[in-house]
Protein backbone atom coordinates (compact mmCIF):
# COMPACT_ATOMS: atom_id res chain seq x y z
CA UNK A 1 0.00 0.00 0.00
CA UNK A 2 1.22 3.52 -0.74
CA UNK A 3 2.61 5.22 2.36
CA UNK A 4 1.66 8.65 3.61
CA UNK A 5 5.21 9.83 3.01
CA UNK A 6 5.16 8.58 -0.59
CA UNK A 7 1.82 10.19 -1.28
CA UNK A 8 2.74 13.54 0.21
CA UNK A 9 5.99 13.54 -1.76
CA UNK A 10 4.00 13.07 -4.95
CA UNK A 11 1.38 15.57 -3.86
CA UNK A 12 4.03 18.15 -3.07
CA UNK A 13 5.45 17.81 -6.56
CA UNK A 14 2.00 18.11 -8.12
CA UNK A 15 1.10 21.08 -5.98
CA UNK A 16 4.37 22.80 -6.83
CA UNK A 17 3.66 22.43 -10.54
CA UNK A 18 0.20 23.84 -9.92
CA UNK A 19 1.53 26.94 -8.23
CA UNK A 20 0.60 25.88 -4.69
CA UNK A 21 2.56 23.96 -2.13
CA UNK A 22 2.71 22.14 1.17
CA UNK A 23 4.12 23.29 4.46
CA UNK A 24 6.17 26.47 4.12
CA UNK A 25 5.06 27.01 0.54
CA UNK A 26 1.45 26.79 1.60
CA UNK A 27 1.96 29.37 4.33
CA UNK A 28 3.72 31.73 1.93
CA UNK A 29 0.90 31.34 -0.57
CA UNK A 30 -1.71 32.05 2.07
CA UNK A 31 0.20 35.18 3.05
CA UNK A 32 0.55 36.15 -0.62
CA UNK A 33 4.34 36.21 -0.19
CA UNK A 34 5.09 33.25 -2.45
CA UNK A 35 7.86 34.04 -4.94
CA UNK A 36 9.24 32.10 -7.88
CA UNK A 37 12.47 31.30 -6.04
CA UNK A 38 10.45 29.53 -3.33
CA UNK A 39 8.81 27.27 -5.90
CA UNK A 40 12.09 26.56 -7.65
CA UNK A 41 14.00 25.57 -4.50
CA UNK A 42 15.19 22.01 -5.13
CA UNK A 43 17.43 19.80 -3.01
CA UNK A 44 19.09 17.14 -5.19
CA UNK A 45 19.06 13.69 -3.58
CA UNK A 46 20.40 10.32 -4.70
CA UNK A 47 21.74 9.18 -8.06
CA UNK A 48 18.68 9.69 -10.25
CA UNK A 49 15.81 12.20 -10.33
CA UNK A 50 12.57 11.05 -11.99
CA UNK A 51 10.25 13.84 -13.11
CA UNK A 52 6.78 12.59 -14.03
CA UNK A 53 4.14 14.55 -15.95
CA UNK A 54 0.78 12.97 -16.73
CA UNK A 55 -2.81 13.73 -17.72
CA UNK A 56 -2.23 17.27 -18.92
CA UNK A 57 -5.06 16.73 -21.42
CA UNK A 58 -3.68 19.39 -23.76
CA UNK A 59 -4.37 22.22 -21.31
CA UNK A 60 -1.71 24.78 -22.18
CA UNK A 61 -2.73 27.62 -19.87
CA UNK A 62 -3.56 27.86 -16.15
CA UNK A 63 -7.15 27.02 -15.25
CA UNK A 64 -9.47 26.50 -12.33
CA UNK A 65 -9.56 22.79 -11.51
CA UNK A 66 -11.89 21.45 -8.81
CA UNK A 67 -11.22 17.99 -7.44
CA UNK A 68 -14.24 15.63 -7.58
CA UNK A 69 -16.57 15.19 -4.64
CA UNK A 70 -17.05 11.47 -5.39
CA UNK A 71 -14.46 8.81 -6.21
CA UNK A 72 -15.96 5.34 -5.85
CA UNK A 73 -13.71 2.49 -4.79
CA UNK A 74 -14.99 -1.03 -5.39
CA UNK A 75 -14.29 -3.99 -3.10
CA UNK A 76 -10.96 -3.77 -1.32
CA UNK A 77 -10.33 -0.34 -2.90
CA UNK A 78 -13.26 1.22 -1.05
CA UNK A 79 -12.15 3.89 1.40
CA UNK A 80 -8.53 3.75 0.26
CA UNK A 81 -6.33 6.15 -1.67
CA UNK A 82 -7.10 7.32 -4.32
CA UNK A 83 -10.79 6.83 -3.51
CA UNK A 84 -10.91 9.48 -0.81
CA UNK A 85 -12.32 12.95 -1.33
CA UNK A 86 -13.03 16.11 0.62
CA UNK A 87 -12.96 15.88 4.39
CA UNK A 88 -12.00 12.17 4.37
CA UNK A 89 -8.94 12.96 2.25
CA UNK A 90 -7.87 15.84 4.48
CA UNK A 91 -8.31 13.73 7.59
CA UNK A 92 -6.27 10.87 6.12
CA UNK A 93 -3.33 13.15 5.31
CA UNK A 94 -3.79 15.70 8.11
CA UNK A 95 -4.40 18.60 5.76
CA UNK A 96 -5.69 21.79 7.33
CA UNK A 97 -9.03 23.12 6.11
CA UNK A 98 -8.83 26.07 3.70
CA UNK A 99 -5.07 25.66 3.28
CA UNK A 100 -3.24 25.73 -0.03
CA UNK A 101 -3.01 21.95 -0.05
CA UNK A 102 -6.73 21.68 0.75
CA UNK A 103 -7.45 23.87 -2.28
CA UNK A 104 -5.15 21.83 -4.51
CA UNK A 105 -6.28 18.38 -3.41
CA UNK A 106 -9.93 18.58 -2.27
CA UNK A 107 -13.16 20.19 -3.45
CA UNK A 108 -14.67 21.90 -0.39
CA UNK A 109 -15.01 25.70 -0.44
CA UNK A 110 -13.49 25.68 -3.90
CA UNK A 111 -14.98 28.98 -5.08
CA UNK A 112 -13.75 30.99 -2.11
CA UNK A 113 -10.33 29.31 -2.07
CA UNK A 114 -9.94 29.80 -5.82
CA UNK A 115 -10.48 33.50 -5.33
CA UNK A 116 -7.53 33.49 -2.94
CA UNK A 117 -5.13 31.02 -4.55
CA UNK A 118 -5.94 31.51 -8.24
CA UNK A 119 -5.60 29.19 -11.21
CA UNK A 120 -3.52 26.03 -11.44
CA UNK A 121 -1.22 24.54 -14.05
CA UNK A 122 0.08 26.01 -17.28
CA UNK A 123 2.78 24.52 -19.49
CA UNK A 124 4.93 27.63 -19.15
CA UNK A 125 5.04 27.12 -15.37
CA UNK A 126 5.75 23.43 -15.77
CA UNK A 127 8.56 24.28 -18.19
CA UNK A 128 10.10 26.61 -15.61
CA UNK A 129 10.06 23.87 -12.98
CA UNK A 130 11.51 21.29 -15.37
CA UNK A 131 14.26 23.69 -16.44
CA UNK A 132 15.17 24.35 -12.82
CA UNK A 133 15.37 20.65 -11.93
CA UNK A 134 17.36 19.90 -15.07
CA UNK A 135 19.81 22.67 -14.19
CA UNK A 136 20.32 21.12 -10.75
CA UNK A 137 20.50 17.49 -11.86
CA UNK A 138 21.71 17.63 -15.45
CA UNK A 139 22.29 14.18 -16.91
CA UNK A 140 21.00 12.52 -13.73
CA UNK A 141 17.38 13.43 -14.53
CA UNK A 142 14.71 11.58 -16.51
CA UNK A 143 11.58 13.42 -17.68
CA UNK A 144 8.75 10.96 -18.34
CA UNK A 145 5.34 11.72 -19.84
CA UNK A 146 2.55 9.40 -18.65
CA UNK A 147 0.14 10.16 -21.48
CA UNK A 148 -3.22 11.87 -21.96
CA UNK A 149 -1.12 14.72 -23.29
CA UNK A 150 -1.97 15.31 -26.94
CA UNK A 151 -5.78 15.68 -26.85
CA UNK A 152 -8.84 17.18 -25.09
CA UNK A 153 -8.56 20.90 -25.83
CA UNK A 154 -9.77 23.16 -28.65
CA UNK A 155 -6.26 23.80 -29.95
CA UNK A 156 -5.33 20.11 -29.93
CA UNK A 157 -8.56 19.33 -31.79
CA UNK A 158 -7.84 21.93 -34.46
CA UNK A 159 -4.21 20.81 -34.90
CA UNK A 160 -4.83 17.06 -34.53
CA UNK A 161 -2.46 16.99 -31.56
CA UNK A 162 0.38 18.88 -33.23
CA UNK A 163 0.25 21.83 -30.84
CA UNK A 164 0.94 19.60 -27.85
CA UNK A 165 3.66 17.65 -29.62
CA UNK A 166 5.42 20.92 -30.46
CA UNK A 167 5.08 22.32 -26.94
CA UNK A 168 6.18 19.12 -25.23
CA UNK A 169 9.24 19.00 -27.50
CA UNK A 170 10.50 22.14 -25.75
CA UNK A 171 10.44 20.24 -22.44
CA UNK A 172 12.55 17.45 -23.99
CA UNK A 173 10.94 14.36 -22.42
CA UNK A 174 12.95 11.15 -22.40
CA UNK A 175 9.95 8.87 -23.05
CA UNK A 176 6.15 8.77 -22.98
CA UNK A 177 3.20 6.38 -23.11
CA UNK A 178 -0.43 7.04 -23.97
CA UNK A 179 -4.20 6.73 -23.72
CA UNK A 180 -6.34 9.51 -25.21
CA UNK A 181 -3.61 9.93 -27.82
CA UNK A 182 -5.11 6.87 -29.52
CA UNK A 183 -8.34 8.74 -30.27
CA UNK A 184 -6.38 10.55 -32.97
CA UNK A 185 -6.45 7.26 -34.88
CA UNK A 186 -3.73 4.70 -35.46
CA UNK A 187 -2.23 6.39 -38.52
CA UNK A 188 -1.95 9.80 -36.83
CA UNK A 189 -0.54 8.37 -33.60
CA UNK A 190 2.16 6.49 -35.52
CA UNK A 191 2.92 9.60 -37.59
CA UNK A 192 3.42 11.72 -34.48
CA UNK A 193 5.22 9.03 -32.47
CA UNK A 194 7.73 8.40 -35.25
CA UNK A 195 8.71 12.09 -35.30
CA UNK A 196 8.90 12.77 -31.56
CA UNK A 197 12.65 12.47 -31.16
CA UNK A 198 12.11 10.32 -28.06
CA UNK A 199 10.42 6.92 -27.67
CA UNK A 200 6.67 6.35 -27.36
CA UNK A 201 6.72 3.23 -25.17
CA UNK A 202 3.86 0.73 -24.94
CA UNK A 203 4.64 -2.92 -24.27
CA UNK A 204 0.93 -3.82 -24.33
CA UNK A 205 -0.16 -2.45 -27.73
CA UNK A 206 -0.16 -5.04 -30.52
CA UNK A 207 -1.19 -5.41 -34.12
CA UNK A 208 -4.58 -7.16 -34.08
CA UNK A 209 -3.73 -9.43 -37.03
CA UNK A 210 -0.26 -10.76 -36.23
CA UNK A 211 0.19 -9.65 -32.59
CA UNK A 212 3.34 -7.73 -33.51
CA UNK A 213 4.34 -4.89 -31.19
CA UNK A 214 3.29 -1.49 -32.51
CA UNK A 215 5.66 0.51 -30.28
CA UNK A 216 8.91 -0.21 -28.42
CA UNK A 217 8.31 -1.78 -25.02
CA UNK A 218 11.19 -0.23 -23.11
CA UNK A 219 14.23 2.00 -23.23
CA UNK A 220 17.45 1.79 -21.25
CA UNK A 221 19.02 4.99 -19.92
CA UNK A 222 22.31 5.65 -18.12
CA UNK A 223 21.70 8.11 -15.31
CA UNK A 224 23.88 8.85 -12.29
CA UNK A 225 25.94 5.70 -12.79
CA UNK A 226 22.80 3.55 -12.87
CA UNK A 227 21.19 1.74 -15.78
CA UNK A 228 17.52 2.72 -15.70
CA UNK A 229 15.03 0.66 -17.69
CA UNK A 230 11.77 2.48 -18.48
CA UNK A 231 8.91 0.25 -19.61
CA UNK A 232 5.81 1.82 -21.16
CA UNK A 233 2.30 0.63 -20.33
CA UNK A 234 -0.50 2.29 -22.32
CA UNK A 235 -4.08 2.38 -21.02
CA UNK A 236 -5.09 -1.30 -21.28
CA UNK A 237 -8.82 -0.70 -21.75
CA UNK A 238 -8.63 1.82 -24.58
CA UNK A 239 -10.95 -0.09 -26.98
CA UNK A 240 -13.57 -0.24 -24.20
CA UNK A 241 -13.25 3.26 -22.76
CA UNK A 242 -12.91 4.91 -26.19
CA UNK A 243 -14.56 4.17 -29.56
CA UNK A 244 -13.10 0.97 -30.99
CA UNK A 245 -13.36 2.25 -34.55
CA UNK A 246 -10.64 4.80 -33.85
CA UNK A 247 -8.00 2.10 -33.41
CA UNK A 248 -9.37 -0.97 -35.28
CA UNK A 249 -5.95 -2.41 -36.09
CA UNK A 250 -4.56 -2.51 -32.54
CA UNK A 251 -5.26 -4.56 -29.43
CA UNK A 252 -4.43 -3.61 -25.84
CA UNK A 253 -4.81 -5.32 -22.44
CA UNK A 254 -2.62 -5.47 -19.35
CA UNK A 255 -0.46 -8.35 -20.65
CA UNK A 256 1.16 -8.96 -17.28
CA UNK A 257 3.13 -12.01 -18.47
CA UNK A 258 4.70 -9.96 -21.25
CA UNK A 259 5.39 -7.19 -18.76
CA UNK A 260 7.17 -9.64 -16.46
CA UNK A 261 9.35 -10.74 -19.38
CA UNK A 262 10.27 -7.13 -20.13
CA UNK A 263 11.30 -6.64 -16.50
CA UNK A 264 13.33 -9.86 -16.49
CA UNK A 265 15.05 -8.97 -19.77
CA UNK A 266 15.87 -5.48 -18.50
CA UNK A 267 17.40 -6.95 -15.35
CA UNK A 268 19.41 -9.41 -17.45
CA UNK A 269 20.75 -6.47 -19.45
CA UNK A 270 22.04 -4.84 -16.27
CA UNK A 271 19.23 -2.52 -15.23
CA UNK A 272 19.69 -1.41 -11.64
CA UNK A 273 16.38 0.43 -11.63
CA UNK A 274 13.21 -0.67 -13.44
CA UNK A 275 10.54 2.01 -13.87
CA UNK A 276 7.04 1.31 -15.17
CA UNK A 277 5.70 4.38 -16.96
CA UNK A 278 2.07 3.44 -16.66
CA UNK A 279 -1.36 4.65 -17.70
CA UNK A 280 -3.11 1.67 -16.11
CA UNK A 281 -4.78 3.69 -13.37
CA UNK A 282 -3.89 3.47 -9.69
CA UNK A 283 -5.96 0.41 -8.75
CA UNK A 284 -4.58 -1.67 -11.63
CA UNK A 285 -1.05 -0.54 -10.82
CA UNK A 286 -1.45 -1.67 -7.21
CA UNK A 287 -2.30 -5.15 -8.50
CA UNK A 288 0.54 -5.04 -11.05
CA UNK A 289 2.95 -4.28 -8.22
CA UNK A 290 1.75 -7.44 -6.47
CA UNK A 291 1.89 -9.70 -9.52
CA UNK A 292 4.90 -8.50 -11.54
CA UNK A 293 8.23 -8.90 -9.75
CA UNK A 294 11.26 -6.66 -10.13
CA UNK A 295 9.66 -3.26 -10.76
CA UNK A 296 11.12 -0.65 -8.43
CA UNK A 297 9.04 2.42 -9.33
CA UNK A 298 5.58 2.71 -10.90
CA UNK A 299 4.73 6.16 -12.24
CA UNK A 300 0.96 5.90 -12.40
CA UNK A 301 -1.30 7.91 -14.70
CA UNK A 302 -5.01 7.98 -15.56
CA UNK A 303 -6.47 8.04 -12.01
Question: Where are each of the predicted segments found?
Answer:
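Acidic, metal/ion-coordinating pockets
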Residues: 2-303
Amino acid sequence: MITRRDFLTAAAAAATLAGTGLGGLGRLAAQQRLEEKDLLAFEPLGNVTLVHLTDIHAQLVPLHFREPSINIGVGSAKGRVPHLTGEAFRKQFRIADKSAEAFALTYDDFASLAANYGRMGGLDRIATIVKSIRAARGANMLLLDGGDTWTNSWTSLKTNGQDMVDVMATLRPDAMTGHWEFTLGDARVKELADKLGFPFLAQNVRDSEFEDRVFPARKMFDRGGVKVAVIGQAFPFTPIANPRWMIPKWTFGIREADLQKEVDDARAEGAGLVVLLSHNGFDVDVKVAEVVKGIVVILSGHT
